[in-house]
Amino acid sequence: MNNFHRILYSNDEIIKQRNTKWYFAVIIFIVSVMLIATPFVSAKLLESPKSLMNQFKGVENGMIQALTDYDCQITNKTLDCQQEFSTYTNGDYQFFINVTEGQELDLPDKYVLFSQEVVTIFTRDGHLQGDYTLLDGTSFNELLELKEEENLDNQTLTGHLLQNISQSTLGTHIPQTYISVFIQYFIYVGLVSLVNMAINANRLKEKISFKQFVTMNILAMFSLALITAIIGLFSPVNATAIFPLLYMARVIMIYFKLLKSNQN
């Protein structure tokens, strides 16, 4: 493809390249999707103990109570407690300890659930779920000993526990994110291209095929996806909001450019 670099900034070039080979458009689409997904992935990777504690305010005292009152060992990524299932309330959170699979629970608005395989923290504003992968081989007593040895306060230790729980899902979170973004924009590009065809059916002298509209809409993604990925490394939340707005603006500009050039 000649003048590839020009599609990064030139809408005219995107229109000119609408007949490019299909496999090149597929490659551009896949790379763009990976770039668009970067903010979602980096948001997970950049989660800090402090940010997690801000999300789940007031959970720390109840977590320390769980470590203090229950004799539990994590072996082969499974929680093994000497005590039977029990529940207690600390602050705004209700805690469920040693929950077995299939056990029925009456869950409140805010809760922390330690099952044998998974930890879940839930509030109306968000939730966190993960397993014991990064805590494997430790016990509640050892975590308390670490707190004393390192002179950690309740918030700091709890923040690191939440981070370990969150990061345990990276192996599934990252591929799921890429697949989700791929499906989302596969449908989105197809729908936008169909709308382009419907609007332009009787307005353009030169007929533009569905494939050509798809190609133009894919080429329009690349530079914006690159910008999104760069911003996402520093500000994931802003990056995820910016791309759809920029992309739709560019698609509209290409549409009017195409309409103007086709009528001349």
Where are these regions (language model features)?
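Internal alpha-helical transmembrane segments
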Residues: 1-56, 225, 230-232
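Membrane-interface extramembranous regions at the lipid-water interface
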Residues: 2-27, 162, 166-167, 203-212, ...
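Alpha-helical membrane-embedding segments
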Residues: 38-42, 82-97, 236-253
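Membrane-water interface at transmembrane helix exits
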Residues: 40, 192, 196-204, 228-232
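Long, solvent-exposed extracytoplasmic domains/loops
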Residues: 50-167
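Alpha-helical propensity feature that highlights long, continuous alpha-helices across diverse contexts
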Residues: 123, 171-178, 182, 239-247, ...
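Selective detector of the "anchor" transmembrane alpha-helix that sits immediately C-terminal
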Residues: 172-202
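Alpha-helical transmembrane segments forming the membrane-embedded cores
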Residues: 203-264
